[in-house]
């Protein structure tokens, strides 16, 4: 087992680990420490939901690094009701509306899916992503827990104590009415919308808290005829546990709750029940669960008063956005998921984005050009960690990103800048022979022997280029010289091209071509190679670069010129940049 030393004061993960270890020793000395997450497979499980997993994962992993036994539970809330038909999900249509109100495990999967039901269809890609990310966890299906009677005693207890539960809930109902439903802090328009949307993907979304005309009942049966939760409890006998309910479909039934396994506790009672049942010490919650009267706040009262447990240490986590897009909602189809992110970036980079920010800090994950800057920052951090110049917090985040207590995650053997790889596969359109030729020329002192050395980063860059870069932003090298533009060149432009072409062979590497393209304008201005940039020199370089881009790709901008020149190749560069003889 690889255990990487991290300063105990280095970062937010270490501080939470300290707190959790101390709290576990107070509550349950000698027992495994329990951290928990909850995910509802009501639709695509987006990158905001991933924070629900990564926050306790990182804390649990730090606890394991210190030699403590720690289990990370992930509860699949697959017994939640199907609330609405999400937009943008392939393989479904308006007919899925007939399943609204059923447990997610009773809803058919989208057409063409190989999975048995809706919940399994949306769990599967998340399970695969968690494996790639190195997340070690113990899964719990809430469908299995409820339908096999695991929570029977807790359900009967909640029904016996329904008056006390109702009194606790009523305190918060009163507070909310008095406060006018105010939310803590100030949210901008985007954050407010995101808060409402996030609730749709949680167990708290759109459900009543158990109030009925006949009284308060914290248990909601699923109808035995239509399988939906459009039911109302109308009577309950504590002695016999006989429960009477009616359903909107017209069915009415009496069941014995000591035997009945087709229903669940309402969310604000279900969550604290699970805290006590599992002995959870640490579980974060989103903003939608942390406002006055929310499930986390109410649960903190119920877990002790009703179920004899204690509320977990529970930091609120902020939203995760997408670069260039509004924040996400799992109730809406088409939102980026962990699988989408891992399609274009390596697992350590995605882990790093969650590890480097405190849970209450928002951040964005880039699917646009910003991903190139993120990769530059990541590679720079790796070099700083290697030479010992990284700050303790940055070094800790890097360590948590590249591995876990169980070992290091797979890495690309021959690391090259993501933006360089993206530019190369953009120009070569993925042709492996051309790509390898260019990669071999990048650095003659450390040549790439095979494409496998640059994988998986090369493959991630290629998928980003082909799936996230608009067609009008792709690089298309001209098929032949722009004879009209070449004929219009002035003597200064012709001389600058002559100097560039004359230096190609001597400078044919990424570093050499960088020196060459920046050096030609210096020569034209009569300046020494090591001169500091001046406004005049910068202007001359911009004009020279624009000329090269126009003659190579027909635009004024493009990928970095040294990379572009390598990708085009010396022979074709000469063809495109050589004016016809006068």
Region spans (language model):
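Active-site cores that bind ATP or allylic diphosphates and position pyrophosphate for catalysis
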Residues: 109, 135-338
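A structural motif corresponding to the C-terminal end of an alpha-helix
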Residues: 66-68, 125-138
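Charged, often glycine-rich, active-site loop that binds/positions anionic groups
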Residues: 79-97, 154-155, 326-333
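Basic, alpha-helical terminal appendages of large translation-related enzymes
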Residues: 1-32, 44-45, 71-73, 174, ...
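N-terminal catalytic cores of NTP/NDP-binding nucleotidyl/phosphoryl-transfer enzymes
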Residues: 2-90, 272-291
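Catalytic adenosine-cofactor/nucleotide-binding cores of aminoacyl-tRNA synthetases and other
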Residues: 291, 296, 303, 318-470, ...
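Residue-level signal for inorganic ion chemistry
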Residues: 46, 158, 346, 548
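A glycine-rich helix N-cap at a beta->alpha junction
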Residues: 93-116, 129, 133
């Amino acid at each position: 087992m690889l255990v990487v030393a991290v300063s105990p004061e280095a970062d937010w993960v270490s501080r939470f680990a300290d707190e959790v270890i101390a709290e576990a020793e107070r509550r349950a000395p000698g027992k495994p420490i329990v951290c928990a997450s909850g995910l509802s497979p009501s639709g695509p499980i987006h990158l905001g939901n991933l924070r629900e997993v990564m926050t306790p994962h990182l804390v649990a992993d730090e606890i394991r690094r210190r030699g403590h036994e720690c289990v990370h539970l992930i509860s699949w809330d697959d017994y939640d009701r199907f609330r609405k038909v999400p937009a943008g999900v392939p393989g479904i249509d308006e007919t899925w509306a007939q399943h609204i109100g059923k447990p997610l495990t009773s809803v058919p999967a989208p057409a063409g899916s190989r999975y048995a039901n809706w919940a399994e269809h949306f769990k599967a890609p998340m399970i695969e992503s968690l494996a790639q990310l190195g997340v070690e966890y113990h899964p719990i299906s809430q469908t299995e827990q409820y339908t096999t009677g695991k929570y029977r005693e807790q359900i009967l207890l909640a029904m016996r104590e329904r008056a006390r539960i109702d009194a606790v809930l009523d305190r918060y109902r009163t507070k909310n009415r008095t406060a006018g439903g105010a939310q803590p802090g100030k949210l901008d328009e985007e954050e407010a919308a995101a808060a409402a949307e996030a609730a749709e993907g949680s167990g708290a979304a759109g459900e009543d808290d158990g109030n009925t005309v006949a009284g308060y009942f914290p248990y909601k049966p699923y109808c035995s005829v239509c399988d939906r939760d459009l039911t109302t409890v109308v009577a309950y006998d504590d002695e016999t546990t006989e429960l009477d309910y009616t359903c909107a479909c017209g069915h009415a039934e009496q069941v014995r709750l000591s035997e009945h396994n087709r229903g669940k506790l309402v969310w604000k009672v279900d969550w604290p029940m699970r805290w006590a049942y599992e002995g959870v010490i640490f579980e974060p919650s989103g903003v939608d669960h942390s406002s006055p009267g929310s499930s986390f706040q109410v649960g903190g009262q119920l877990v002790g008063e009703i179920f004899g447990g204690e509320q977990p240490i529970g930091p609120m986590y902020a939203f995760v956005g997408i670069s260039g897009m509004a924040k996400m909602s799992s109730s809406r189809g088409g939102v980026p998921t962990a699988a989408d992110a891992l399609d274009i970036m390596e697992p350590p980079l995605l882990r790093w984005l969650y590890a480097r920010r405190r849970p209450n800090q928002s951040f964005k994950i880039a699917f646009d050009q910003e991903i190139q800057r993120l990769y530059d920052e990541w590679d720079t951090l790796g070099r700083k960690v290697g030479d010992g110049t990284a700050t303790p917090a940055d070094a800790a985040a890097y360590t948590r990103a590249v591995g876990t207590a169980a070992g290091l995650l797979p890495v690309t053997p021959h690391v090259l800048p993501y933006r360089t790889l993206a530019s190369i596969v953009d120009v070569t359109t993925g042709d492996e022979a051309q790509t390898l030729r260019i990669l071999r020329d990048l650095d003659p002192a450390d040549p790439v022997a095979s494409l496998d050395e640059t994988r998986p980063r090369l493959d991630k860059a290629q998928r980003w280029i082909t799936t996230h870069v608009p067609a009008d932003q792709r690089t298309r090298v001209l098929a032949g010289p722009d004879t009209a533009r070449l004929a219009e060149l002035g003597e200064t432009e012709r001389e600058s091209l002559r100097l560039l072409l004359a230096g190609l062979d001597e400078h044919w590497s990424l570093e050499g071509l960088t020196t060459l393209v920046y050096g030609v304008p210096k020569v034209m201005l009569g300046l020494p190679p090591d001169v500091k940039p001046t406004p005049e020199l910068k202007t001359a370089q911009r004009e020279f670069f624009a000329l090269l881009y126009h003659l190579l790709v027909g635009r004024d901008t493009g990928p970095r010129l040294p990379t572009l020149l390598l990708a085009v190749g010396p022979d074709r560069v000469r063809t495109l940049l050589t004016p016809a003889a006068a």
